[in-house]
């Protein structure tokens, strides 16, 4: 019996929150941590799922009976991938799949997309099915949207399947065009620090869907297919509803920030706001950090998806010397990403832990986010 081992990474989003489903720009990078799927083919048309993180009885699914809503809980994500592959015309066969993960669940680092993509690659390989990765990302997104019921965009699956080591990936969510830009913070003595606030988020809850509906209404009123297609910030003034105005302003400015950071990271590219040569890496990370902090304020005040622990973490990190910080993921819980110099790293961690405990909150957990390769076969 052939056993295959497939790994798909989580992701951190350097810039562009809630811009993906608005057809704007996003700038994620893959993490070293992710989900591993150890899989063997079955001849009985069943998918049998086990997870080390959910050590209950195995979840057994008949491929022929899969339909949206037929599987719930964590198993809905891999089941949804099998359903979406078959619905897209790919005759994947049954498999026994053991899942393991070193990603925190509900921390805004796309554990669900990593689960989907590792299983999708395993099912395709065991079934002798070839799917281009760009298309597989869309299939995994369909699984999350239609089978699981989370109205997410394309960023998470694209990051899991298409990222490169030592790069961030600028994705135009309108055209799905990708530009890989160098992102090597360690070479500049900088750490991309993920702060898990220990407040779990769930994107199937109503607030995420409400934000998406508000964006769609704002786009309709502005006469465009999606807010990400608007480049003139003054266009938001045409929106009479102050809530819709704020939502649109966030999408337009965050998409612009994603492009600005991507341009800044390109080798030898001068850019507005910095010296012409800009080989001072500290100067570059101060520039990027400033944009991260601007993005957090936009997510907090205009898009209203932040939460108290994230706001405190961002403020404390910056006060302790971080270049900048922002919440990442869909919001309402999850993590903060901070750019911190190596010499300030221990102090930032210590101050954040002390600040959380003093407020009666669980101590945050930390993860050094190293830009890593996309999903791949391990064995």
Predicted stretch roles:
Residues 23-30, 211-212:
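Short Gly/aromatic-enriched secondary-structure transition segments
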Residues 1-11, 15, 36, 40-71, ...:
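C-terminal nucleotide
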Residues 47, 113-117, 335-339:
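FabD-like malonyl-/acyl-CoA
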Residues 332:
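Glycine-rich phosphate-binding loop
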Residues 1-7, 11-18, 22-25, 63-64, ...:
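Gly/Ser-rich oxyanion-binding loop with an adjacent helix/lid
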Residues 97-99, 195-197, 336:
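A structural signal for short, well-ordered beta-strand segments
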């Amino acid at each position: 019996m052939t056993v295959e081992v497939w790994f798909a990474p989580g992701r951190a989003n350097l810039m562009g929150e809630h811009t993906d489903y608005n057809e704007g720009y996003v700038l994620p990078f893959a993490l070293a941590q992710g989900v591993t799927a150890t899989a063997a083919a079955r001849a009985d048309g069943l998918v049998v799922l086990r997870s080390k993180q959910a050590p209950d009885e195995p979840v057994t699914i008949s491929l022929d009976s899969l339909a949206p809503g037929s599987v719930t809980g964590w198993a809905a994500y891999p089941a949804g991938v099998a359903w979406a592959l078959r619905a897209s015309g790919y005759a994947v066969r049954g498999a026994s799949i053991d899942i393991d993960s070193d990603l925190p669940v509900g921390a805004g680092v796309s554990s669900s997309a990593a689960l989907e993509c590792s299983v999708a690659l395993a099912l395709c390989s065991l079934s002798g099915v070839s799917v281009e990765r760009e298309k597989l990302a869309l299939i995994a997104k369909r699984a999350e949207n239609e089978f699981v019921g989370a109205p997410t965009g394309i960023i998470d699956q694209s990051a899991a399947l298409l990222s490169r080591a030592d790069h961030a990936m600028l994705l135009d969510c309108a055209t799905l065009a990708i530009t890989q830009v160098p992102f090597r913070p360690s070479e500049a003595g900088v750490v991309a620090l993920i702060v898990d606030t220990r407040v779990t988020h769930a994107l199937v809850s109503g607030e995420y869907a409400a934000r998406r509906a508000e964006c769609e209404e704002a786009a309709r009123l502005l006469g465009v297919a999606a807010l990400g297609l608007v480049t003139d910030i003054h266009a938001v003034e045409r929106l009479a509803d102050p809530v819709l105005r704020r939502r649109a302003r966030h999408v337009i400015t965050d998409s612009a920030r994603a492009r600005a950071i991507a341009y800044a990271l390109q080798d030898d590219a001068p850019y507005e706001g910095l010296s012409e040569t800009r080989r001072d890496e500290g100067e570059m990370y101060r520039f990027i950090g400033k944009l991260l902090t601007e993005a957090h304020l936009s997510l907090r005040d205009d898009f209203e998806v932040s939460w108290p622990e994230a706001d405190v973490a961002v403020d404390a990190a910056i006060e302790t010397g971080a270049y900048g910080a922002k919440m990442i993921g869909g919001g309402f819980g999850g993590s903060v990403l901070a750019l911190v110099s190596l010499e300030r790293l221990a102090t930032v961690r210590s101050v954040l832990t002390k600040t959380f405990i003093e407020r009666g909150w669980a101590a945050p957990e930390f993860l050094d986010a190293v830009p890593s390769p996309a999903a791949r076969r391990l064995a």
